[in-house]
Amino acid sequence: MPKRTKSVTAKAGAGAANSNQPFAISRENAEHYRWGVDCDGWHLVRDKNLSVIEEFMPPGAAEIRHYHEHAQQFFYILSGEVLVEANGENTLVPAGSGIRILPGTPHQIRNPTSSAVHFLVISQPPSHGDRIDVPPA
């Protein structure tokens, strides 16, 4: 007997982070926030153990150099490319690639290009509230 397929969609503002039921999540129904100068983030998953955020970074934008005491992060580039400085080393990360940042590692992500960048930030545990700003390298 074939298995039934059900649609798993959510209405805007459905609170994906707090739901125990599976459903499709996107920017359209995720919690949105602004950061930096003209940068956007959407919480696709947000719970006490894991954070998955889709972020948009316009040309020339950069975050403040910082580190996280507890959170490890993985940045996966969906489109465009970013320059990631970690521990004083610069790494160009193009679309289809990612970079892992371990807890305690000073880092900064920048978009030095003339095109916008979309990327995922996966943090475990979540990095919000676990950020310590540091001077530029």
Model-derived regions, located:
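A short, N-terminal "cap"/entry segment at the start of jelly-roll beta-barrel domains
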Residues: 1-50, 64, 130-137
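Conserved short histidine dyad/triad with adjacent acidic residue
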Residues: 38, 53-68
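Short strand-connecting beta-turns/loops that link adjacent beta-strands
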Residues: 48-50, 70, 114-115
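Short, charged/polar surface micro-motifs in flexible loops or helix N-caps
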Residues: 48-50, 58-61, 81, 125-128
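Glycine- and acidic-residue-biased ligand/ion/polar-headgroup-sensing regions
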Residues: 70-72, 76-82, 87
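Structural motif
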Residues: 81-83, 90, 106, 116
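Short acidic-glycine-tyrosine-enriched beta hairpin
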Residues: 88-103
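Ligand-binding loop in jelly-roll beta-barrel domains
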Residues: 103-129
